[in-house]
Amino acid sequence: MTQQLQNIIDTAWENRASLSPSAAPREVQDAVEHVIAELDAGKLRVATREGVGQWTVHQWIKKAVLLSFRLKDNELIEAGSLGFYDKVPTKFAGRSAAEMAATGVRVVPPAVARRGSFIAKGAILMPSYVNIGAYVDEGTMVDTWATVGSCAQVGKHVHLSGGVGLGGVLEPLQANPTIIEDNCFIGARSEIVEGVIVEENSVISMGVYIGQSTPIYDRATDTVSYGRVPAGSVVVSGSLPKGDGKYSMYAAIIVKKVDAKTRSTTSLNDLLRD
């Protein structure tokens, strides 16, 4: 079934210029809808973990997400006295109290998650935004005004602090999703974008910005890397000298490995997850 779906999506992607809500084969519409429904239920995901820092990205699923915009017209979405006009409905629209209780998710108004995102049991959405294709795993808190971009992958027991931004893949078009692995703490107003991977048990301090071109300097080893924060790192914003010391440029600095003191200041509060 999965291989058949992939073949349909890949073929439709090659012919995407000819697709529209009124001009798409039923087979393509059904395949795209099936993928979105499976993403919404957490049965499919854009990327799957093979080990620490090791991920397989399923490009055909990302293509299905993009095709879904090609196959839908905008429609009126109402929420009380508010009105919206979009192609993607919200994730929890029309659910009863019993159905919401069964998800094990707490959603604080006016948090928004789009259909096609998955929010696992024990997760908390403060007034925040989770885009289509994103995966938020168990026990994670998405704090106030944080944004989980399209197809971003967030692990178990992660804390995304207020105003954190995780980049998406839809616009500008990115090859790989942004990934935050299990037990990470992302400090307020930090931005992780462009498919950067933050490996498990890491702590990103407040106001750190990391994209694929951001130097990540490890002061313990005096090395620079890009696109990946090693497991168990504590990262702050800083700069590195350039041009024979004439100027400096922004960098993310790994100042140490996570220790007991770090954990005590970034631990999750179980009282908030009852």
UniProtKB/Swiss-Prot annotation:
SUPFAM superfamilies registered for this protein in UniProt: Trimeric LpxA-like enzymes
Reaction catalysed by this enzyme: (S)-2,3,4,5-tetrahydrodipicolinate + succinyl-CoA + H2O = (S)-2-succinylamino-6-oxoheptanedioate + CoA
Keywords: Acyltransferase, Amino-acid biosynthesis, Cytoplasm, Diaminopimelate biosynthesis, Lysine biosynthesis, Repeat, Transferase
Documented EC number(s): 2.3.1.117
Pfam families: Hexapep_2, THDPS_N_2
Keyword Cell cycle attributed: no
Residues in the signal sequence: none
Main location: cytoplasm
Species of provenance: Paracidovorax citrulli (strain AAC00-1) (Acidovorax citrulli)
NCBIfam families, alphabetized: dapD, PRK11830.1
Subcellular location: Cytoplasm
Pathway(s) of this molecule: Amino-acid biosynthesis; L-lysine biosynthesis via DAP pathway; LL-2,6-diaminopimelate from (S)-tetrahydrodipicolinate (succinylase route): step 1/3
PROSITE patterns given in the database record: HEXAPEP_TRANSFERASES
Domain of life: Bacteria
Family note: Belongs to the transferase hexapeptide repeat family.
Record flagged with keyword Repeat: yes
Listed GO MF terms: 2,3,4,5-tetrahydropyridine-2,6-dicarboxylate N-succinyltransferase activity; nucleotidyltransferase activity
UniProt-recorded name of the protein: 2,3,4,5-tetrahydropyridine-2,6-dicarboxylate N-succinyltransferase
GO CC field: cytoplasm
Binding site for substrate: 106, 143
Oligomeric form and interacting partners: Homotrimer.
Biological process (GO), any one: diaminopimelate biosynthetic process
